[in-house]
């Protein structure tokens, strides 16, 4: 069973994952983060991301897809939607966009349940983007 939360930054995904951990305990494995470990390696994230960042994120989603009986904070939906936004802003090239798109199509059906989390009021935690326009763009792309 593969379950994931998806949504913009500041939409409650991490809070819901923590609630799942508290409730289900060791009945599932958990993927807490995808993007922040990449940021800790020095790559820019969110609206500042580029080809290297998005490829690393898509690669992480491919690795997470190999897990079974897992609940994840994000999934390939997020990787694709953020890459799509960056492509529209000419921050990633067509090759990176195509990689995200083909990976999305290759692994999306492996997910059993995807919960979409609606955006909440922005809260600065020191890492997430607090750009409300960016959040709205991502939310709009996710609802298409």
Listing of model-derived features with the role each one plays in the protein:
Residues 9:
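The conserved Walker
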Residues 13:
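Conserved lysine of the Walker
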Residues 52-109:
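Glycine-rich phosphate-binding loop used to anchor ATP phosphates in small-molecule kinases
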Residues 5:
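Hydrophobic anchor at the beta1->P-loop junction of P-loop NTPases
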Residues 18-63:
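Conserved substrate/cofactor phosphate-moiety recognition/catalytic segment
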Residues 2:
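Walker A (P-loop) ATP-phosphate-binding motif of ABC ATPase nucleotide-binding domains
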Residues 33, 73-76, 115-121:
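Short loop/turn segments at strand-loop or loop-helix junctions that form parts
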Residues 87-142:
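A glycine- and Lys/Arg-enriched "phosphate-lid" helix/loop adjacent to the NTP-binding pocket
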């Amino acid at each position: 069973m593969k379950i994931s939360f998806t949504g913009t930054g500041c939409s409650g995904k991490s809070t819901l994952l923590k609630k799942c951990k508290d409730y289900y305990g060791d009945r599932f494995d958990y993927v807490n983060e995808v993007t922040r470990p990449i940021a800790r390696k020095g790559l820019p994230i969110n609206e500042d991301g580029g080809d290297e960042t998005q490829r690393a994120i898509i690669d992480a989603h491919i690795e997470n897809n190999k897990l079974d009986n897992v609940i994840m904070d994000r999934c390939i939906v997020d990787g694709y939607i953020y890459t799509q936004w960056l492509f529209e802003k000419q921050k990633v090239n067509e090759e990176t966009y195509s990689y995200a798109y083909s990976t999305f199509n290759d692994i999306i059906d492996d997910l059993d349940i995807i919960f979409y989390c609606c955006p909440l009021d922005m809260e600065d935690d020191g890492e997430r983007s607090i750009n409300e326009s960016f959040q709205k763009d991502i939310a709009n792309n996710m609802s298409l």
